[in-house]
Structure formats: structure tokens, C-alpha cells
Amino acid sequence: NVRDIKPGELGMKTFLDMAWDIDKFDFDNINNHQVDFLVSIFGERYREDIEDVMNSYYHLGFQHKPEAMGWGYEWNNEHVQERMTDTDFSFINYNEAEGRIQEYDRISDKSEKIWNALPESHKAAFYELVFYPVKGAALMNKKMLVAQQNRWYARQGRTATNYLADRVKSYHDSIDYYTDKYN
């Protein structure tokens, strides 16, 4: 059982096209393949925005995949519960965490603008191929990074910890909402 192919459809299309004719691909054009496919569905007028969104999405994902943002989980240990540890993205040095959140917000907003502008007949496909992966990655990063910031604030005894905890819960609930629409 290979499960649902929906989340792997775009990558599978690229892989199968490469298997069919590898000579069409090289270092300079590989990034354009998915954009060309998406533009063939959603329209040439969205090329620049789709290219920007997808390039940033893959760049951020290469730095760290959103589904592994909780990479500090300690499994099978002496603790009663698994413990979440902080990511390597810093809130102190070079605005790493904030910059990551801002970039995900930027591409998430851009993908939502495209989705809103599309005709109804194209919205489901765009939601599956672009909007949901980008929005989900943005929300997962925000959830995990704001939780990290919350733990930092709690160690300092700041009263803002309750506010941050509410934001984390909101991001979690938003992931559930968008996932329900995706499925």
C-alpha cells in the first residue's frame, strides 16, 4: 500500500518526467520544471509569483523540513513525557527565527493571493499543489518557533508566555483547519 499520492504528486510528476527523458533536464532548468507545469495549469500570468513561492518554499524546506521542526524530541528516555528541545534557529542572533517566519508569511500570503484570484474551477488543484503545502509549512514553522520563544520567555519569567502559548495553540488549530480542507 503506497497510501495517498496527493502530497507527492508534484514531485512524482518531476521524477517520472526525468525518467522519461533525462536529457531534457540539467542544473540550470530543473527548478523551472515544476513552475512550468504549474503555469500550464494556472496560467502564465502567475509565473513570476509561482516561481517565487516555490523557490522560497524549497529553499526554506532545504534548510529544515517543516515536518521535522520538532527535531529535538527525546524518545525512549527516562522522562515521563517526551521533551521538546529548541531548534537551531535563534531569536537572539541575526534574527534567524524571525526571518524564517517572515519569509514563510510572505510566500504564504502570496500563494493565498493567487488562490483567491483563480477561477473556482482551478482552486482545488492550486490548494493541493501549492497553497496547502506552503501554508502548512508556514504554520508548522510558526508553531514550533513561537513555542521555542515561549520556552525562552518562561525561563526568563516573562508574562508574555501566556500570549505566546495562545499563539502556538492558534497555529496548531489553523494547521488542523487547513488540513481538514485539504483532505
Q: What do these predicted regions represent?
A:
Residues 4-45:
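Catalytic or ion-translocation cores adjacent to nucleophile or general acid/base/metal-coordination motifs
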Residues 32-183:
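Catalytic domains of carbohydrate-active enzymes that cleave complex glycans
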Residues 1:
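Globin-like tetrapyrrole-binding proteins
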